[in-house]
Amino acid sequence: MLWKSFSSVWNHYNVPRNETGFDFPGKDHVLNIAHRGASGRFPENTMTAFAAAIEAGAQMCELDVQRTRDGAVVVIHDDTVDRTTDGRGAVGAMTLDEIKRLDAGIRFGDDFKGERIPTLEEVLALTDGRCGLNIEIKSDGVEREFCHLICQMIVSHGALATAMVSSFDWNVLAVVRDLEPRIRIGLLASRSPLRLLNAAFEMRAESINPKVDIVTEELCVAAHKRNLNVYTWTVDEPAQMRRLIAFGVDGIMTNYPERLRELMG
């Protein structure tokens, strides 16, 4: 019944397929998006993981950003440093100097001891001309000033054509769009595909970024009719990658970008 509702809502539209999406060198049908870098083999959200992702064939790296007490934008998934570093405490309660003293590799193994939490500026510099970025803004207590900082960095690094901002909090994306309409946005969701399509279309988003569990061929068709790309997460098994490619997804976020590269030939 859900897909009958899709048809009734969308069948009177006839929007051409997106011809202005990301088009990186080597992109062949499906965008290879490294989830927190090549995080299956390297410490997530580190410079090593991003460099390895590029080497493994990723055309885009997905990452997460948080803000330090003194206003720096750092690349880390959690709002605390407990899980991924040798420290403890909230990211927002620490200065950048304190964050930089933490070891972001030791929990992944002794071979990665000494890895540091990078700033967004550092990752933008590393990936410049090498791959795109999907910058996820977490949903808790995000301020307009934080969004403004991220927009400024994207513009100042000349990354408007290769970067996008995504979030589960679509209000955050509305703020980003208000601050800098040229920045592409992607709406994250783990449920309610019809609501996701509606919101993304109304916001003129680059993409919907649905959890793999809710991706179907019908969803991809409906998204494409709305001029929306479908970037799904997080997919590590080649068999599942093949199925999603057959459905018509435009991008796959994976912890193992080398697997998607091999599958794509």
Label for each model-derived stretch:
Residues 1-265:
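Phosphate-group recognition and catalysis centered on beta-loop-alpha active-site segments
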